[in-house]
Amino acid sequence: MISISNLVFRMKKNAVGLATIAILSSMVLVTLVGAASIYAGKKDYLMSAAPHDYSVSGNKVDLTSTKKLMDDFLIKTGEQANEEVAVSYLFFGIKNQETNKLTVFTKNERKVVPKSIVLVFSQETFKQLTGKELNLSSNQIALYTKNKTLKTQKSLSIDGKNYQIHRQLGDFINKKVPNIYKIIVSDYSYLVVPDIKIFESSMKGTSIAQATYVGVNVKDPTHDAKKNLDLLDQIAGEATKQLDGQTPGVPESYFSANSRYDAEGMVNGFVGGTFFIGIFLSIIFMLGTVLVIYYKQISEGYEDRERFV
């Protein structure tokens, strides 16, 4: 009974110290796990942002023009493409959602933050990326979505136009076409439609936009990587200047270049810095925990000496 009461007395007296030890230990674990998770997710993010060694993206330009830039780049560098992906798609932002009814931003709405982003591909592009056919009828679509509500729906309404969801898909553009909007919103969807031109014409007056992507993998991506990216940047910049109907300083149609080498450098800089800070903070928290335990034991020792000696 005496030993139990003594234990309770000590726990009450040292409650602050025990709580500090528990908090610091928890902070060590949280910081380590968080930093390790970010570092481990680096590869997946990189493959999502830059799935190919070199790529050219276009906004409101045709796929043929985008592909020509990549062909010019390969000729000038002497690189040979082991793998190539060339696609054209549409994208738009969602202003509001009520169950399976989506409202799209209008063409004149600027500086908005969408609730969700939708990328639209033709079934021909889907077959090109996956090797599978869908055979969609005129009012049918196939859907991949991160939206929990839409995953259970049988139909979808987009600005009052109704479509039947033929089937739910997996992430068919992963490691093939970049989705840069993942860093803006966590809620996004991919639609596959039977005819992308008909779908685009049905969305007149909305903020829907057209984009192209051409990506290639080469035999030795590290060979002259910086020099090659500078060349690809130059080719894309010169091609953008030659596009018709540009507003000076604010190009609506443009080309942009990217490389996995460049993206990897930026990601490594961010992730490496975060990982270092995580390790550094973990060491500080661990030292704090050790010091609290050490001085707590010393104080208890002096207290016992005064009581029993």
Model-assigned labels for residue ranges:
Residues 11-32, 70-74, 78-82, 89:
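Acidic, Ser/Thr-rich low-complexity segments on the non-lumenal side of membrane proteins
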Residues 16-38, 265-306:
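Hydrophobic alpha-helical transmembrane segments of multi-pass inner-membrane transport and secretion
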Residues 46, 52-59, 63-278, 284-287:
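Basic-flanked hydrophobic alpha-helices used for secretion and membrane insertion
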Residues 2-18, 56-69:
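Cytosolic juxtamembrane regulatory segments of multi-pass membrane proteins
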Residues 1-8, 301-309:
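Juxtamembrane inter-helical linkers in multi-pass membrane proteins
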Residues 30-52:
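Hydrophobic alpha-helical transmembrane segments in integral membrane proteins
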